[in-house]
Amino acid sequence: MPRHGFTAWAFTKWNLALATLLAASGCAGGFGSGAIASREPGFRATSVRRPALLVRVSVPGEVDKRERDRIPENYEAAVVEGLERAGILAVDMVSVPGSSARPLEGLDRTAALSRAREAGAEQLVIVDARLSQGVLTHCKQSGRARSGPTTYWDVGLEIRRVADGQPLLVEPPAEDLRAVDVELDCKTNRLIRRKSMDELITDSVGLVLAPFSSR
């Protein structure tokens, strides 16, 4: 994956105030995706071998344009590399522009399935990631919860059978699929460090592609 030295964004007072307002209203860090988690009985993602791939990576407009262009490229490359490490070679890949929609919402699946059929794929794999910044709460399970500004990826995974378009696996955005830039010592409630964007992308892609390596 290309290195580019992008680090966590600095919060301005306006950003922090906005993030706090969003958190208070239940908007920041929420998982309101309309997609419902599901799996066709007996289906395992490890059975996928030569799918078509659809990737959407959404980055906020506040990010510098150069990084806004580069981050999706790096994320897409990480997805392809991750699938290849699992022995999965995509027969076709298309990336669609980012949007303000939640992961797995607002995608043209009909067009993607049509293209997948033309490519001779048996499955369509959709990876839909969105980069955000907001106030999140960490260390909940330790009993020493701490809230603070966080850069994070929310991501959804969907696998469809190309022949009839039926969903085989749907994993909408969820807390256990969220990659965050904050590393905290939950015992002392102290910030250890903030991850680079490269690390954050690697973490996010590893989480969303986990079903392809599960045995």
Residue ranges, per PLM feature:
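Sec-dependent bacterial lipoprotein signal peptides
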Residues: 1-26
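Solvent-exposed loop/turn segments at secondary-structure junctions
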Residues: 59-61, 130-135, 177
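A structural "domain/chain start" motif
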Residues: 27-98, 208-215
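Surface-exposed acidic loop/strand-edge motifs in secreted or periplasmic proteins
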Residues: 89-114
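C-terminal/domain-edge helix-coil "capping" segments
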Residues: 27-48, 147-215
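Stable alpha-helical elements in mature extracytoplasmic
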Residues: 71, 75, 79, 108-112, ...
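Alpha-helix termination/capping residues and helix-transition junctions
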Residues: 21, 45, 118-121
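Surface-exposed short loop/turn segments
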Residues: 106-167
